[in-house]
Structures are given as structure tokens and as C-alpha cells.
Amino acid sequence: MSSELSNFFQSLSIQEEELEAWVTNLQPVFPMQEKPSCRRCDYKPKYRNTVSPHNPNGNAGRLYYICIKCKTDQDCEVSKTDHQKGWISWDDDRGVHPSNQNCDCGIVCRQDRAGENSSCPGRGFWTCATGSCGYSSYRKDGRTEEEAKDAKAAPDGGFEPWLF
């Protein structure tokens, strides 16, 4: 076999490894090309919102989507607190990194931090980067509580997010 042909096949195997790594750690693109749908009721928001410049959580100016149907529905039991009601997703790549574990959508998840109005202000957690699935974890390793129970692992508490 000629060295030129050998080099070609060698480059193919490198590309194959890179492709496998890329497929394993798919990253979402921000800003989102399409408005996300609410994972609770499938509503597609008409507008993208911007966090107030006076936000105390360090999120001033960040873009995000909420579901107005779930936000105003008094009977919505999915979110028990007002600050979570109707939340869909941030529309930026803050906290999204190729080394993050994958969520239930198969894309890398987002590392985030609970706001000051939450029951655990400042607590780190993992969530779906685009809000498409219900993935959420307060574990350092990103496993859900069900996955941790299945693995019979010792519980690990919350963590301080590295990105803040």
C-alpha cells in the first residue's frame, strides 16, 4: 500500500474518533435557532425575555424563555414555587461545557445555580441546557437520584458550581 493511501486511512480513523467524541458530547447551539417548547404543555413562547439589570443573582441581561401558560396557570402542580413556574430555559451557553454529562436529550447539560428566592439559594445543579427534557440533578456527578439508587451509591450533597 502506498504511503499516501496509508496516510489517508490513518486520517479516516482519527476523524472517526473525533466524530465519536462529538456525537457522545453533542452541544446545543445558542442563541437557539428555534424557540423551545415547554416540556410540560408543549406551548411555544412568542418572545424571548431578558433578565432585569437589577437581578441579584448575577443573571442581569441574560436571555431566557418562559411558558406563559404554565406561569399563569394556578392549577399547575409541576412547579410548586412561583420562581420555577413556567420556566423553560436560558438562551445562552453559560454553564454548558463539552465535559458536562449528557441529559436525557442526549446533549450536554447545563450547570446552573439556584437563585436567592429558591429553597436552597446558591446550590449548584445540573439541568437540560435547552429545557427540552426534565433532566435535573443536584449530585456532583450529575446522576439523577434514581440512577444513584440503582447504582447503590452513597448520596452526595449539593455543590458549588464552578462557573460562578
Regions found by a protein language model. Give the residues of each.
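Intrinsically disordered, low-complexity linker/tail regions enriched in polar/charged residues
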Residues: 2-164
